């Protein structure tokens, strides 16, 4: 089935893991096929494969609670289909409260005390970097779910770390493809002042200038994460008289920014390009105040009707009684990625796991994805569209799916970015 825009225009076909199968088979049976590689070493009489999962459950519940639902759904389906290497998956989940020091302490407890076979998860980019460094120093494997900074796989990339979600570079490249077509020359940016925000702005500016040398950035605002003075930020941006704004705020910061910027006229007669804003976690809280016409990355959960996504959405709604969010997709895909990597490795020692995950292909609700061997970044993509109002709430309209593989740099560029890459 093709992806289609909200107006019905067909998009590029995407391969489906569910073609010709029942919905139940799409969730479980297809994985049994793809993960039924020889159950060789490490069978250990069915001892569970233990995954130490760490995330910011109390700090960012809008994303991480649906994320937890997603991985729980996936683990249940994988185990029902026979598990991995003939063994069930067992997830030991911990809350880092949005604090790197807590994440490191929990990682130590999971690896050294609980003897987990690998680490997974993470939301904030600084926590993802901390967990990657822990894995490097302690001979563990870390599969990052949500942390978006490119340093995780490039500047600070290392063999023990793989990342699922499309990164700041990838999402910036998707947005720049639209932004470069705008007539605007004078740009301003607003982003949370930590690793994710800094990385997103750096790449957006660099990629946009490469496409549009006439562009200049006339203002930038760096509010502290979770502590935006939205009125002051809106006033400062407006005073710089930009023709377009690049926004990287999310969550409560985004809500405050929209509510303060709108009445001040900040968004009138200005294009806004915004990372993540089309994801339900961040769009839904705005209700009828959701902006109209912003160019965003996001997730059209109610509109996406490919077989793989319908199977996932139906199973998710049946179990949890609500629509999935982007966090749900990330949690779900993360466990399938782990299952595929472990299956390909055939055993659980670190060297085998690294070799197994490098190049591992896995199913997701958006279609097939794969971990690149050269930088350990997955090819999972996301959606680009425009915000609109429908039924008194914000929705993603005129959307298209962008395969992550189409926006990733080639091997030569990765070697320049990632030290020690052969």
For the regions a language model picked out, list residue spans one by one.
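Extracellular/periplasmic Venus flytrap/periplasmic-binding protein
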Residues: 105, 150-151, 159-263, 300-311
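Beta-alpha junction/loop-to-helix N-cap segments that form part of ligand/metal-binding clefts
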Residues: 63-69, 84-152, 164, 223-230, ...
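Extracytoplasmic "Venus flytrap"
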Residues: 52-72, 94-100, 123-124, 193-198, ...
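Extracellular/periplasmic periplasmic-binding protein-like sensory domains
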Residues: 260-332, 343-344, 348, 397-421
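Solvent-exposed, acidic/polar segments of extracytosolic/periplasmic ligand-binding ectodomains
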Residues: 47, 361, 365-422
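Periplasmic-binding protein-like
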Residues: 110, 114-123, 143-145, 188-191, ...
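N-terminal secretory signal peptides
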Residues: 1-21, 25, 29-35
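Signal peptide-proximal N-terminal region
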Residues: 46, 69-91, 210-213
């Amino acid at each position: 089935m093709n992806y289609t825009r909200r107006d019905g225009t067909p998009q590029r076909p995407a391969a489906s893991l569910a073609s010709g199968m029942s919905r139940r088979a799409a969730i479980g049976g297809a994985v049994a096929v793809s993960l039924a590689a020889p159950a060789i070493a490490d069978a250990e009489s069915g001892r569970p494969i233990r995954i130490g999962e760490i995330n910011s459950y109390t700090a960012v519940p809008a994303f991480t609670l649906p994320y937890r639902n997603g991985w729980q759904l996936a683990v249940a389906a994988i185990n029902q289909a026979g598990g991995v290497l003939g063994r069930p998956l067992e997830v030991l989940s911990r809350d880092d409260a949005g604090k790197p020091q807590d994440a490191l302490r929990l990682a130590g407890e999971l690896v050294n005390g609980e003897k987990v076979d690998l680490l997974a998860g993470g939301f904030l980019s600084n926590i993802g970097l901390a967990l990657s460094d822990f894995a490097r120093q302690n001979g563990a494997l870390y599969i990052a779910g949500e942390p978006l900074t490119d340093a995780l796989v490039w500047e600070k990339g290392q063999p023990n770390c793989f990342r699922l979600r499309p990164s700041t570079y990838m999402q910036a490249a998707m947005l720049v493809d639209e932004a470069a077509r705008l007539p605007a020359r004078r740009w301003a940016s607003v982003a949370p002042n930590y690793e994710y925000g800094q990385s997103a702005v750096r790449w957006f500016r660099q990629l946009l200038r490469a496409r549009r040398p006439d562009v200049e950035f006339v203002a930038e605002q760096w509010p502290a994460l979770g502590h935006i003075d939205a009125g002051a930020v809106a006033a400062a941006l407006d005073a710089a008289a930009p023709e377009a704004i690049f926004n990287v705020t999310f969550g409560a910061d985004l809500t405050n920014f929209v509510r303060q910027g709108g009445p001040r006229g900040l968004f009138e007669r200005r294009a806004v390009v915004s990372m993540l804003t089309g994801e339900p976690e961040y769009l839904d809280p705005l209700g009828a105040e959701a902006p109209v016409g912003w160019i965003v990355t996001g997730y059209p959960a109610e509109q996406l009707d490919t077989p793989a996504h319908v199977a996932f959405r139906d199973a998710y709604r049946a179990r949890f009684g609500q629509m999935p969010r982007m966090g749900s997709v990330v949690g779900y895909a993360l466990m399938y990625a782990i299952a595929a990597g472990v299956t390909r490795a055939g055993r659980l020692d670190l060297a085998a796991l690294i070799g197994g995950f490098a190049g591992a292909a896995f199913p997701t609700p958006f279609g097939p994805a794969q971990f690149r061997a050269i930088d350990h970044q997955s090819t999972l993509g996301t959606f680009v569209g425009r915000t609109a109002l429908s039924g008194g709430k914000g929705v993603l309209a005129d959307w298209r799916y962008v395969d992550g593989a189409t926006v990733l740099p080639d091997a030569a560029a990765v070697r320049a970015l990632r030290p020690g890459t052969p």
